[in-house]
UniProtKB/Swiss-Prot annotation:
Coiled-coil blocks: none
Compositional bias per record (Acidic residues), positions renumbered to this chain: 351-363
Cofactors required: Mg(2+)
InterPro entries: dUTPase-like_sf, Herpes_Orf11, HSV_DUT
Lineage of source species: Viruses, Duplodnaviria, Heunggongvirae, Peploviricota, Herviviricetes
Gene designation: DUT
EC number(s) on file: 3.6.1.23
Biased composition (Basic and acidic residues): 77-88
Organism: Human cytomegalovirus (strain Merlin)
Protein's name according to its UniProt entry: Deoxyuridine 5'-triphosphate nucleotidohydrolase
Gene Ontology molecular-function annotations: dUTP diphosphatase activity; metal ion binding
């Protein structure tokens, strides 16, 4: 097959040997070895670094100018018209210059520190886990993500008794929260320093329409929704892989992430984060950690996909409940602690934020419930009192 494709492109085009790992070819740039026409008879070899998927982009391989590039969106400072807002200082402008993500601390059980271009955090107090599967906890930081970027939280917890789920942060004012999944039916105490992780901000990328297959248009934050097509029934303690009728064509330097939505915290479901490979159908692994059968109704948004110009990788971990972790690259955009920032002044307190979020969840559950509660059998037995 490769010989036939090579003959159709150019008899002087030779493909390098494929890597051993079947995932490595998506994360490392393949090398195209071409002979220069103006070279002597002995032939001088030119190594051209081209990230080309031969299955979809074979007709563009001979074009040396073919490259899907990404340009950073115009910074908010350039869009901010100072003439229309005279008398305002730099602290009241939408974003500081150079482009950095402003953030401020809030009272919580976590310590947040700036580490290079990431925010590192760990718990300073004991976190009590009740019999409820997922317990949302504020990370004690608020940040403003500029338009055209997204944030994501990563955790380095290797305990087999609980798992912390990553979260995608949309652009705008965000207050990240920690979702701790209790994998036992008993109370647990998480000691200080056990939960640690990072927050990074990366640029979004929207592929061309011809590069996407069966994907709905993205929302205003450049996130793509993945919905179920039929009713899914997951038994207690069972794991099921859900595939979506969607795919995308490989573009040079592009990576796609799939992360489950937070609304599933009420149904004891764990959606494993996935790196979506090009040329493959989108899919996620759903784990039912409850003792009851859960039914997911059709046309339910199960996960969100986002494209970026930074490449993420897997790290297999045997002691991790999910068996693997997603390792983020080093972000190019850093953070700056500016609690006096005008946009950060609108951040509500953690208590008020939890109340508002609960009310929003109740309203959104009426409009679009991720789990059909009429088909779900919940454990309604008596529960012991929750520890403070």
């Amino acid at each position: 097959m490769l010989t036939m494709l090579t003959d159709r492109i150019d008899s002087q085009l030779v493909l390098s040997r494929l890597p051993r790992s079947r995932f490595q070819r998506f994360w490392e740039t393949p090398t195209l070895i071409m002979k220069e026409e103006s070279a002597p008879s002995s032939g001088s070899i030119i190594l051209a670094e081209k990230s080309v998927n031969m299955r979809y982009c074979v007709r563009f391989a001979s074009d040396s100018d073919f490259q899907t590039t990404f340009t950073l969106p115009q910074s908010t400072e350039e869009k901010y018209d100072k003439e229309q807002h005279p008398g305002e200082d730099e602290a009241s402008s939408p974003l500081p210059s150079p482009l950095k993500v402003p953030y401020k601390w809030m009272p919580s059980s976590f310590i947040v520190k700036q580490c290079h271009t990431q925010l590192a955090f760990y718990n300073k107090h004991i976190i009590w886990l009740s019999r409820e599967r997922k317990v949302p906890t504020s990370l004690g930081v608020s940040l403003y993500i500029p338009e055209g970027f997204f944030g994501i939280t990563f955790y380095k917890c290797l305990d087999a008794q609980f798992v912390c789920m990553p979260e995608l942060l949309e652009s705008g004012l965000q207050v990240p929260q920690l979702d701790v999944v209790n994998l036992n039916d008993t109370f647990q105490s998480i000691f200080p320093g056990t939960i640690e992780g990072d927050i990074g901000v990366f640029p979004c990328f929207v592929p061309e329409p011809w590069q996407l297959m069966n994907l709905p248009p993205p929302n205003e934050h450049r996130f793509f929704s993945l919905r179920t097509r039929q009713t899914l029934v997951i038994g207690p303690g069972h794991t099921q892989t859900v595939y979506f009728d969607a795919a995308y064509v490989h573009a040079p330097g592009i990576c796609a992430l799939i992360v489950g939505v937070r609304q599933f915290s009420q149904s004891d479901l764990i959606i494993r984060p996935t790196i979506w490979l090009p040329g493959t159908a989108a899919g996620v692994t759903v784990v039912n950690t409850s003792h009851t059968t859960v039914c997911i109704s059709p046309h339910t948004t199960v996960a969100k996909a986002v494209f970026t110009t930074h490449r993420f990788t897997y790290l297999p971990v045997g002691s991790h409940p999910l068996g693997q972790m997603i390792v983020p690259p080093t972000p190019d955009i850093g953070f700056t602690h500016t609690p006096e920032h005008a946009l950060l002044q609108r951040t509500p307190s953690p208590v008020d934020d939890d109340v508002d979020e609960t009310e929003e969840d109740e309203k959104s559950s009426d409009a679009e419930s991720p789990v059909n509660t009429s088909d779900v059998i919940f454990d309604v037995g008596p529960k012991p009192p929750r520890h403070p």
